[in-house]
Structures are given as C-alpha cells and as structure tokens.
From Swiss-Prot:
One of its GO terms (molecular function) is toxin activity. It comes from Dispholidus typus. The lineage of its organism: Eukaryota, Metazoa, Chordata, Craniata, Vertebrata. The keyword NAD does not apply. Residues 1-19 form the signal peptide. Its main location: secreted. InterPro entries: Snake_3FTx, Snake_toxin-like_sf, Toxin_cobra-type. Belongs to the three-finger toxin family. Ancestral subfamily. It holds the Pfam family Toxin_cobra-type. It comes from the Eukaryota. Disulfide bonds join C24-C45, C38-C63, C79-C84. GO terms for cellular component: extracellular region. This is Toxin 3FTx-Dis4. It is found in: Secreted. Keywords: Disulfide bond, Secreted, Signal, Toxin.
Length: 86
C-alpha cells in the first residue's frame, strides 16, 4: 500500500513540474505591463527593438520557442527565466 501511495505521489509531482510554463512580458510598446503565460514548448522570452526611420524605435516583447536571427534594423535579445524581458 505504501508503494502504491509513493508511486501516485511521484507521478503527480512529475505531472505538476512538467506542466509549468514560462511567463513573459507581452506588449508592443515601451511600457510593458501585460504578463503572458507562454504556450507549451515556448521556453524563452524575447525583446525585439526595431529601428524605423520615420517613427524611431518600436519595442515588441513576448514568448518564443527558438532564437531567430534578427532582421534588418532589428536587435533581439532572449532570456530563459520568468518575466526576464521587462
């Protein structure tokens, strides 16, 4: 009986640990207050700064699954802890 109980506790613990998702700031402006629960597999937060000749700089923050190469006039940083892209 103790073995069965221990097995159930271990399975429950593994289920809870594997179900935790990253949280990241998610917005399209300089002031970023929204926190997003990332989808499964998205273990990175990013901050993308886009330089535009007309409007200056635009900042986008959110969740990502992989690190992508920045485009022209972009600077992208990635991090792997909760809300690290603030």
């Amino acid at each position: 009986m103790k073995t069965l109980l221990l097995s159930l506790v271990m399975v429950g613990f593994m289920y809870l640990v594997s179900g935790q998702n990253r949280t990241c700031r998610s917005c399209t402006g300089a002031l970023c207050l929204k926190i997003e629960q990332c989808k499964e597999g998205q273990n990175l937060c990013f901050e993308r700064k886009i330089t535009d000749d007309f409007f200056g700089m635009k900042t986008v923050r959110g969740c990502a699954d992989t690190c992508a190469n920045p485009g022209e006039n972009e600077k992208v940083t990635y991090c792997s802890t909760d809300n690290c892209n603030s």
